[in-house]
């Protein structure tokens, strides 16, 4: 949960708007494509950690501290993904559309 007050949020939003307003549409589109690819990569990696955590949870030979470490890693990854998703959303808002980004073959 975000602990910032409404004036801090407004200041942050104005700063983001100003940052993207100086960029051309082609620059914004390139940034959006890069952010979309990064988002997909994070989702793929997060899913791999989650699946490992689930497998470890079902294995009685895995110690509690190891399970806790996997859970902590997953939660930390979720927080990073949330921040990246917010940034992507801001970029797409500034751009005005979602560019078509084909999936990479390696994911």
Swiss-Prot record:
| Keyword Repressor in annotation | yes
Region (Disordered) location: 1-20
Pfam families registered for this protein in UniProt: Prok-TraM
An individual GO BP term: negative regulation of DNA-templated transcription
User: Which parts form a coiled-coil structure per UniProt?
Assistant: none
Q: Which InterPro entries match?
A: Tscrpt_rep_TraM, Tscrpt_rep_TraM_sf
Q: Which UniProt keywords apply?
A: Plasmid, Repressor, Transcription, Transcription regulation
Lineage, top-rank taxon, reads Bacteria
**Keyword Transcription assigned:** yes
Q: Per the similarity annotation, which family is this?
A: To A.tumefaciens Ti plasmid TraM.
* UniProt function note: Acts to antagonize TraR-dependent activation.
Task: Please state what the protein is called.
Answer: Probable transcriptional repressor TraM
Q: Which organism is it from?
A: Sinorhizobium fredii (strain NBRC 101917 / NGR234)
